[in-house]
């Protein structure tokens, strides 16, 4: 293609993504757009086509982003090239959303006609506005009996401040309004602005590992052109590779002769190791490099940490490889090796949130076949020592001696909870119980309220989300962002079995709740740990002070069964002998801790 044609083609490209709260019909809308533009033949069509991971289909959520090229012939007779970049809607995957948005010029905002705006919708809209995207509101599910498009229209205008007068009323399920949406994309989404003649700059927004071709980069070309045979250079580490193949996704990978400015596609350059590529890096040509990289994504910092240990210790290396492969297309997963006396060798992993943690654990168990034990999740605490030093600690077993600690600060998040009016009381009670501080609340419409609290992240990490859903019959939606660190009265609680600390069961707790938390745990462990041949005390301790204790009674054989009648001293001798045996056993015996014991520390408030 000559320059003229490339520039003309660039004017026909539209890059957009779809943003929505969970279950507002984002993946279904993507399906309809694929069908309408005949990208996928009806034979290959299946619901939620872009959610290709089993886990995504089962949970009905989108986890990974996906990029597809479609051709659409508009009413003006021209054929346009659409790049649809599908994004997740869940709070833990915000970084996936920000990555998708960095590759786009426009965003379709899908809002459910019955439910209206939810917390996540807002969070994603703000991300889109940060990226200066053209936002097109669409009111979806208008075929539902409870749909009230006019109310939602005013909501979009009042709460977000977007002009919704031209918002398309659609039903992705019934296929209503799809054509209008496509026409609006052509009219409203701007064409890419890059320069074809400039040195190549392409943003890596994802990467996947292929056993045959190495690491395959998914890129959005911002400036210039890339084709097979070029020598590319990664700007973060200056490594160079030879391009073997470039192409696009129509969900399947299809090879192309080149990728030019505005294109979204993949580059295969036989990159062998996972560590060479970072999502958010800039690809340029080694022969004619760009002067400076694109500003990538802000590095996502993990907020939740937990230990992952293989149940079979010989699977340790498999677990490392699996984590490396997951890290390849999940840049926010961090891990480092750690050992525990109770669990052996494993990794300390950092996650963005609980759903992220859950999904990673499931992917490890499914895709890589590794059975795992996971320790209680914790957050990063700032510990200020008496000698003026300060340290960041995410693992309870690394906490310094209590006598050396001056103060401990913990992270607080600003939580936005959107909830129908009748549940406001329940939500406030829950937030108070989780040590939350009330900030403000405002009414979105006659019925829905946005309540804002400052809550310690450590309290949210446990089971806040489940509790919120159950106390509001599932109507609340919830979004949080890290706000600040505050000093708190925190203590580290150790659990002792038979006098020995079990490092994997230690956790950090607020001083005011320490006693009841300790009592709860020892009672719970008593039910779970099987009885031994000797008595096992279970203790909860803060430093050297025991705050709760319970004993697992010993199993004992009736040694007097063979003494029909007989002298009392004979009986006493047998009992003393048994007692001495038990004592000896106790001094050398070790207690097996079953898997459930570690999990019981997680699910604290179920009683």
Curated annotation (Swiss-Prot):
InterPro entries: EF-4, EFG_III/V, EFG_V-like, EFTu-like_2, G_TR_CS, LepA_C_sf, LepA_CTD, LepA_IV. Residues 11-193 form the tr-type G domain. It is a peripheral membrane protein. It is an enzyme of class 3 (hydrolase). It is found in: Cell membrane. GO terms for cellular component: plasma membrane. Belongs to the TRAFAC class translation factor GTPase superfamily. Classic translation factor GTPase family. LepA subfamily. This is Elongation factor 4. It comes from Streptococcus pneumoniae serotype 2 (strain D39 / NCTC 7466).
């Amino acid at each position: 293609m000559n320059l003229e044609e490339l520039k003309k083609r660039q004017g026909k490209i539209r890059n957009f993504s779809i943003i929505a709260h969970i279950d507002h019909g984002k993946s279904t809308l993507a399906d309809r757009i694929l069908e309408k533009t005949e990208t996928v033949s009806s034979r290959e069509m299946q619901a939620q086509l872009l959610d290709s991971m089993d886990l995504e289909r089962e949970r009905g959520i989108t986890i990974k982003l996906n990029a597809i090229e479609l051709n659409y012939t508009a009413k003006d007779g021209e054929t346009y090239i659409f790049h649809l970049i599908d994004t997740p809607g869940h709070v833990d995957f915000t970084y996936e959303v920000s990555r998708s948005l960095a590759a786009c010029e426009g965003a379709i905002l899908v809002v459910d006609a019955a439910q209206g705006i939810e917390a996540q919708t807002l969070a994603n809209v703000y991300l889109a506005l940060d990226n200066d995207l053209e936002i097109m509101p669409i009111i979806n599910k208008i075929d539902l009996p409870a749909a009230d498009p006019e109310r939602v229209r005013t909501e979009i205008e009042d709460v977000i401040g977007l002009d919704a007068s031209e918002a398309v009323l659609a039903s992705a399920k019934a296929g209503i309004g799809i054509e209008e949406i496509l026409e609006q994309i052509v009219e409203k989404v701007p064409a890419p602005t890059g320069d074809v003649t400039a040195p190549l700059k392409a943003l890596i927004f994802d990467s996947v590992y292929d056993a045959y071709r190495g690491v395959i980069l998914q890129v959005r070309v911002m400036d210039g052109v890339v084709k097979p045979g070029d020598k590319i250079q990664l700007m973060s580490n200056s490594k160079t590779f030879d391009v073997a193949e470039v192409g696009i996704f129509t969900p399947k990978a299809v090879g192309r002769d080149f990728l030019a400015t505005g294109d979204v596609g993949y580059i295969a350059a036989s990159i062998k190791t996972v560590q060479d590529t970072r999502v958010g890096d800039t690809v340029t040509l080694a022969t004619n490099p760009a002067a400076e990289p694109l500003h990538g994504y802000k590095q996502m910092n993990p907020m939740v940490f937990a230990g992952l240990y293989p149940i079979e210790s010989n699977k340790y290396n498999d677990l490392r490889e699996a984590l490396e492969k997951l890290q390849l297309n999940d840049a926010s997963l961090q891990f480092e090796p750690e050992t525990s006396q109770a669990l052996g060798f494993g990794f300390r992993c950092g996650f963005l949130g609980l759903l992220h943690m859950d999904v990673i654990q499931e992917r490890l168990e499914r895709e890589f076949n590794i059975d795992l034990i996971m320790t209680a999740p914790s957050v990063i605490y700032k510990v200020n020592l008496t000698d003026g030093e300060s340290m960041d600690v995410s693992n309870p077993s690394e906490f310094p001696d209590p006598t050396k600690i001056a103060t401990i600060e913990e992270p607080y998040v600003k939580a936005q909870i959107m909830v129908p009016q009748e549940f406001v009381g329940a939500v406030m009670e829950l937030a108070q119980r989780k040590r939350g501080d009330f900030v403000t609340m405002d009414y979105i419409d006659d019925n829905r309220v946005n309540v804002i609290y400052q809550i310690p992240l450590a309290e949210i990490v446990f089971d806040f989300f489940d509790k919120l859903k159950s106390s509001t019959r599932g109507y609340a939606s919830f979004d949080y962002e890290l706000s600040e660190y505050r000093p708190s009265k925190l203590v580290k609680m150790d659990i002792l079995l038979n006098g020995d600390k079990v490092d994997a069961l230690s956790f950090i707790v607020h001083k005011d709740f320490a006693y009841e938390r300790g009592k709860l745990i020892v009672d719970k462990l008593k039910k779970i740990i099987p009885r031994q041949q000797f008595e096992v005390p279970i203790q909860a301790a803060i430093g050297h002070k025991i705050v709760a204790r319970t004993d697992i009674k010993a199993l004992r054989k009736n040694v007097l069964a063979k003494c029909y009648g007989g002298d009392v001293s004979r009986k006493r001798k047998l009992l003393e002998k048994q007692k001495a045996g038990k004592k000896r056993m106790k001094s050398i015996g070790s207690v097996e801790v079953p898997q459930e014991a570690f999990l019981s520390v997680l699910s604290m408030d179920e009683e």
